[in-house]
């Protein structure tokens, strides 16, 4: 999303905060040393970060935050918290709510889980052993924005998930059936074809 908003390539491996990778794998290539990306009236502004700029935001503004889990049927999104004081979400969500900023979670359908995420977050808040650096699960009030919403917004077509998973690198994939007028469908399929040529996010 950042790359598309900027309109240019950048070092994505330097814009990684939380991450999920195979157990025991080396993720030292993933950094978090690039500044937050902030736009005001369509133009990028430098020298500010999310925790600072959110105090100037209000109704009509968007705050984008990825999600670790979604439940599409219940319209829920949740973020795993791997920081002792809540990370970016912990530092901003109170201001986001009080200033009526629109919190949007862009996340792939691959993040779908068959769980009530509010109930799951309550269970995870109980004392007990935990594998990895996860302090909790934060079920938010934010809006979901998946491939379904993206295709509807860009091409005014309907996307229906009909399959998930695969082999040889397609383990996190989803299969969508698309419905709409011929021309937007053809345009969407052409773009999807280009996206499918992109390599995995790895060193």
Name what the model sees in each region:
Residues 3, 81-203:
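Internal alpha/beta core interface subdomains
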């Amino acid at each position: 999303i950042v790359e598309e908003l900027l309109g240019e390539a950048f070092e994505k491996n330097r814009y990684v905060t939380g991450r999920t990778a195979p157990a025991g794998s080396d993720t030292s290539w993933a950094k978090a040393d690039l500044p937050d990306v902030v736009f005001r009236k369509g133009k990028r502004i430098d020298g500010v970060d999310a925790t600072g700029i959110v105090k100037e935001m209000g109704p009509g503004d968007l705050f984008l935050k990825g999600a670790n889990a979604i439940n599409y049927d219940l319209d829920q999104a949740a973020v795993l918290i791997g920081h002792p004081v809540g990370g970016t979400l912990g530092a901003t969500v109170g201001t986001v709510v009080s200033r009526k900023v629109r919190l949007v979670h862009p996340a792939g359908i691959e993040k779908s889980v068959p769980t009530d995420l509010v109930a799951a977050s309550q269970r995870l808040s109980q004392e007990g052993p935990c594998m990895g650096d996860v302090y909790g699960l934060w079920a938010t009030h934010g809006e979901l924005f998946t491939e379904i919403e993206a295709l509807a917004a860009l091409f005014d077509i309907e996307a229906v998930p009909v399959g998930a998973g695969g082999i040889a690198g397609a383990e996190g994939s989803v299969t969508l059936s698309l419905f709409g007028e011929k021309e937007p469908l053809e345009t969407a399929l052409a773009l999807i074809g280009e996206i499918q040529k992109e390599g995995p996010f790895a060193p």
